[in-house]
């Protein structure tokens, strides 16, 4: 039976992701990728940027967790090969072919500033097109990560062919479930703390493969269990309260800083809102 709450939670989260990017595009807190704010901080505080501090720590981990839950339910119905074939068709194909057919338009807007500075002067049109296509990768990193995790999941499932680990996770009490948040804290430390300019460090920090693999596997092995969902459903109000308090504390103590920096993401408060926010 399809669980519509997963679909509802997913589309609401996607809308919040879009809302976040509207705010982020005009932020003045030093977050890379936007076009800049209405003036320098702190002369122009731009309090609407609070949205970035509240939403960024948890919405992408939540989407990966939901993807892990959905993968569990799908693999209960289909064999691994059929499921992965469908994943490849729905994820990898749009992330490659779609990059050159549609996302060059996103790349065009990403390169407007560079064009105004004369960076593309003398460069042939087909080369510009290639640059725009690659720079337009944008949200495709999510489905590229998801495809990779789907491949890894098939390998991991062979280690737990009889679902013993999955069944053990379903017996976890509330305290162990909350302590799983420590894994997020450890996952954030896999980021490159001081990314080097003109290297792949920034790209790695964007994809965060190790960090995002954690909620994906949590969704598959832990949160897909009906027993776990029932336990958390009974205490959702206190958990939501903890998330709200953590979010307020994080915003008050870090407002004005780059909320996407590895140092900020690895802070205990960030990890708390990351876990409780889901």
Pin down the residues of each PLM region.
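Alpha-helical transmembrane segments and their immediate juxtamembrane cytosolic regions
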Residues: 1-278
């Amino acid at each position: 039976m399809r669980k519509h709450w997963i679909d509802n939670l997913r589309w609401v989260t996607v809308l919040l992701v879009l809302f976040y990017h509207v705010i982020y595009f005009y932020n003045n807190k030093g977050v890379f990728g936007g076009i800049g704010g209405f003036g320098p901080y702190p002369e122009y505080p731009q309090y609407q940027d609070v949205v970035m501090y509240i939403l960024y720590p948890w919405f992408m981990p939540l989407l990966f967790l939901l993807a892990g839950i959905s993968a569990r339910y799908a693999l209960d119905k289909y064999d691994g090969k059929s499921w992965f074939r469908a994943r490849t068709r729905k994820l990898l194909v749009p992330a490659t072919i779609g990059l050159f057919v549609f996302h060059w338009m996103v790349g065009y807007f990403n390169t407007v500033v560079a064009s105004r500075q004369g960076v593309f002067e003398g460069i042939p049109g087909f080369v510009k097109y290639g640059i725009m296509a690659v720079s337009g990768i944008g949200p495709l990193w999510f489905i590229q990560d998801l495809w990779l995790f789907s491949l890894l999941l098939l390998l991991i499932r062979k280690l737990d062919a009889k679902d013993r680990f999955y069944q053990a996770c379903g017996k976890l009490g509330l305290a162990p479930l909350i302590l799983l948040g420590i894994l997020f804290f450890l996952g954030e430390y896999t980021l490159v703390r001081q990314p080097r300019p003109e290297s792949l460090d920034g790209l790695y920090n964007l994809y965060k493969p190790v960090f995002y693999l954690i909620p994906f596997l949590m969704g598959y092995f832990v949160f897909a269990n009906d027993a776990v969902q029932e336990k958390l459903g009974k205490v959702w109000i206190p958990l939501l309260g903890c998330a709200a308090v953590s979010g307020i504390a994080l915003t008050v103590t870090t407002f004005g800083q780059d909320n996407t920096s590895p140092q900020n993401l690895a802070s205990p408060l960030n990890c708390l809102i990351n876990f409780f926010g889901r």
